[in-house]
Amino acid sequence: MNDLKGKNIIVTGASGGIGNSIIKKLNQAGANILASGTRTEKLDELKSKYKNIKTLKFDISQSDKIEEFVENATNELGGSLDCMVNNAGITKDNLAIRMSLEEWKKVIDINLTSTFLMSKFAIKKMLKNKSG
């Protein structure tokens, strides 16, 4: 992961356990990280624990604000983006047979639609930067 030194990376779902592990590895590799999540206290812990990290609270279920989020996150990283780690997502502790259609739609919207939109807008930034 030495080739990530100085690279600007957005990590969604950073306030959870997997996100924290991803950030630890990226930080060890010398990346500049923009960590995003929904829990302010967890994001504050990341800022105090790691160097080269900035945070933005964001809920990826707000699909109409994803383009604005990617813009703001990229600006926080100095205006360029090299990588997007789509780690945010949800699960429902429910069997499909008991899951309502509304619950299913929420899982799909967050885990698929929001990831698609994050990638779409991040790719535009990476192409502009000729990186990623």
What do the predicted segments below correspond to?
Residues 58-69, 101:
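The beta1-alpha1 cofactor-binding region of Rossmann-like NAD(H)/NADP(H)-dependent oxidoreductases
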Residues 29-44:
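Conserved glycine-rich Rossmann-like NAD(P)H-binding loop of the short-chain dehydrogenase/reductase
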Residues 95-96, 103-108:
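Substrate-binding pocket helix/loop in short-chain dehydrogenase/reductase
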Residues 15-16:
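Conserved glycine-rich cofactor-binding loop
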Residues 87-92:
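Conserved NAD(P)H cofactor-binding loop of Rossmann-fold oxidoreductase domains
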Residues 7, 78-82, 126-132:
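Active-site loop of short-chain dehydrogenase/reductase
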